Swiss-Prot record:
PANTHER family assigned to the protein according to its UniProt record, in alphabetical order: RRNA-PROCESSING PROTEIN EFG1 (PTHR33911:SF1)
Main location: nucleus
Keyword rRNA processing: yes
Protein name stated in the entry: rRNA-processing protein efg1
Gene responsible for this protein: efg1
Organism: Aspergillus clavatus (strain ATCC 1007 / CBS 513.65 / DSM 816 / NCTC 3887 / NRRL 1 / QM 1276 / 107)
Cellular localization per UniProt: Nucleus, Nucleolus
GO biological process, one term: maturation of SSU-rRNA from tricistronic rRNA transcript (SSU-rRNA, 5.8S rRNA, LSU-rRNA)
Positions with biased composition (Low complexity): 179-190
Length: 315
C-alpha cells in the first residue's frame, strides 16, 4: 500500500542548515577592474597639432586667442614627443630583454666565482707577499666583473644594446669523463662566466663605448639616471641628434620638397605651353597649304568647264 502524504512531515529548511541537500548557491567573485594605462593616441595628437597650426595661420586671429593656441600647440608637441619616447623605450626593452638577461646571468656568475676565489686566497696559509700579489691582481678582475654586471643592468633602455658575452660552441667529444673534466678546467682558466658564454672583448680586445661610461657612472653614483636615458645628452650626443637639430632637418627637408613641387609644376606648365605653341604652329602651317590646294582645285574646275561646253548635249 502506498503511504499517504502527510503535510506535517514536510518541514521547511531551517536557517543555518548546512546539509548537502540545502547547500547555498555560490556567489560569484567580483574581481577588481584592471588598471589600464590611458596613454594618448599619436594620431589624435598629430591631428590636434595640425588643427592648431591651421588656426594660427589665420590673419584675423585675435592676439589673446593666438597666445592660448600657441600654448596649446607647445603642450601637444610635448605630449607627442613623450608618447613617442615611451613607445620607443618599450619597444627597445622588449627587443633586447632576453639578451640582457643572458648577459646579466653570465656576469653575476663570473663575479660570484671571483669573490669565492678571493675568499679562498684570503683564508689560505700562503706567504703574505704572494697573497697580497694575488689579491691585488684579483681585485682588478673583480672590478671589471662588477662593471660588466652594472653594464648589463644599467645600460640605457632607450638605446640599442651591445652584448658583452657570446655563446661558445662546444664540440661533442666521445672521450669519456676525462674530456669533460679537461673542458671544465679550460673554461675556469679562461675566466668565462659559465660553460656556454665568453666575454667578447677578451678575444677582440675592444670594449663597447658604453662600458667606460658605466665605469664612470659607478664612481659618480649616477647609474639610475644612465638607465633611464637622462644622461644621453652628455654621452650619446654623436649617436642621436638633439631634437632641435631634428626639427631643423625636417624643416629643411620640407623646404626642399616644396621647391621640388614648385619646380615640377612650373616645368609642367612650360611643357603645356610649348605643346600648345607647337599645335598652333602646325595649324598655321596647315592653313595656307589647305588654301592653296582649294585654289588649285577651283582653277582646275574652271578650266574643265571652258573646254566642255554642253557635254553630252552638244549637237
Amino acid at each position: 500500500m502506498p503511504r499517504e502524504f502527510d503535510p506535517r512531515a514536510a518541514s521547511k529548511r531551517k536557517h543555518g542548515d548546512t546539509s548537502e541537500d540545502f547547500a547555498p548557491a555560490k556567489k560569484k567573485k567580483i574581481l577588481p577592474p584592471k588598471h589600464e594605462h590611458n596613454h594618448p593616441s599619436v594620431n589624435e595628437l598629430k591631428k590636434r597639432i595640425r588643427d592648431v597650426k591651421r588656426l594660427l595661420n589665420r590673419v584675423d586671429l585675435p592676439a589673446d586667442a593666438r597666445i592660448i593656441q600657441e600654448r596649446a600647440l607647445a603642450g601637444y608637441e610635448k605630449d607627442l614627443e613623450d608618447e613617442l619616447a615611451r613607445r620607443n623605450r618599450s619597444q627597445m626593452i622588449k627587443k633586447y630583454h632576453f639578451v640582457r638577461f643572458l648577459d646579466r646571468k653570465a656576469a653575476t656568475k663570473d663575479l660570484n666565482r671571483l669573490l669565492r676565489r678571493e675568499k679562498e686566497i684570503s683564508k689560505s696559509d700562503a706567504d703574505s707577499a704572494t697573497k697580497d700579489g694575488k689579491l691585488a691582481a684579483l681585485a682588478k678582475e673583480i672590478h671589471v666583473a662588477r662593471v660588466n654586471q652594472n653594464y648589463t643592468i644599467y645600460y640605457p633602455l632607450t638605446q640599442k644594446y651591445i652584448a658583452l658575452y657570446a655563446e661558445k660552441k662546444q664540440k661533442k667529444d666521445k672521450k669519456g669523463p676525462t674530456a669533460s673534466s679537461d673542458n671544465q678546467s679550460q673554461s675556469d682558466s679562461d675566466g668565462g662566466a659559465g660553460a656556454g658564454s665568453k666575454l667578447i672583448f677578451s678575444t677582440t680586445g675592444v670594449r663597447p663605448p658604453m662600458w667606460q661610461v658605466v665605469e664612470k657612472c659607478m664612481e659618480e653614483g649616477t647609474l639610475d639616471l644612465l638607465r633611464e636615458g637622462k644622461l644621453d645628452a652628455q654621452i650619446g650626443g654623436a649617436d642621436s641628434p638633439a631634437p632641435e637639430s631634428k626639427a631643423k632637418v625636417t624643416d629643411d627637408a620640407g623646404k626642399v620638397r616644396n621647391q621640388d613641387t614648385v619646380s615640377k609644376k612650373s616645368s609642367g606648365k612650360s611643357r603645356e605651353a610649348d605643346a600648345s605653341k607647337s599645335k598652333q604652329d602646325k595649324k598655321s602651317k596647315r592653313a595656307p597649304a589647305k588654301e592653296d590646294a582649294y585654289r588649285d582645285a577651283k582653277n582646275n574646275d574652271n578650266d574643265d568647264g571652258d573646254e566642255s561646253d554642253g557635254g553630252f548635249f552638244e549637237i
